[in-house]
Amino acid sequence: LLKELDELYAYSNANKVFCVIGYPIEHSLSPVMHNAVFKALKIDAIYFSVKVDVSMLKNAVDMLRNAVNGFNVTIPHKVTIIEYIDELDASAVKVGAVNTVSNSNGRLKGYNTDYHGFIQPIKSRGINLRGKSVLLLGAGGAARAVVAALCDEGIARLIIANRSINSNVKSLINTAMDKGIECKAIILNESNRYSYDCDLIVNATPLGMVDVFNRDKGSNSSNSSNS
């Protein structure tokens, strides 16, 4: 990470620096989108991606605290990152995951924009999810935001498909059941059996990411987890 930061500062004279961290990170279009916006709005800033595996997350956060103005968080760090930042916005508390971190003089505050990023496009199309059945693939940080939004929208039935019925799945099931939603947990490869009975299917896994998922082998080339 230090090498990447040194190379970045040598290359750029930008006044503000932002990044996205994750593992894998090759799929992320965040640098393309953010840098395009910075250029269009004449903002003196640069945005880049940094590959950070789980074992390096704490060290990476410590370095970024003194190096960037803010950063985004993608798989598989959206939940674990909470341990290493100073404060949570109400959005992050509600979801239990963080995908955006602001840096105010070294104090890091976490936010969650996945909730609105998921539900707003659905609402903008006039789709009403109340009373509907939903199949959710995955049980990681993104899935937490999806479940929070689905609960608020009043769905009737939720099926969560994951590689294993782990503690993350059970936590999401409990969250939904507390809202009176009928729930079921299944293994990911059983999804086809249930998909036809659902009104909405949500993919909150790395499946489909460019250069990340090997369709022939049915596993992630990076061995990242959907947990």
PLM ranges: what are they?
Residues 22, 110-115, 122, 127, ...:
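Glycine-rich adenosine-cofactor-binding loop
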Residues 155-179:
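NAD(P)-binding Rossmann-fold cofactor-contacting core
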Residues 4, 8-125:
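Phosphate/diphosphate ligand-binding glycine-rich loop within oxidoreductases
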Residues 71, 134, 201-202:
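Receiver (REC) domain switch-region micro-motif
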Residues 17, 133, 156-158, 182:
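Residues at the starts of beta-strands that form the adenosine-phosphate
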Residues 11-12, 129-130, 152-154, 216-221, ...:
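Short, conserved loop/helix-junction motifs that constitute active-site signature segments
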Residues 1-6, 224-225:
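C-terminal helix-to-coil terminal segments
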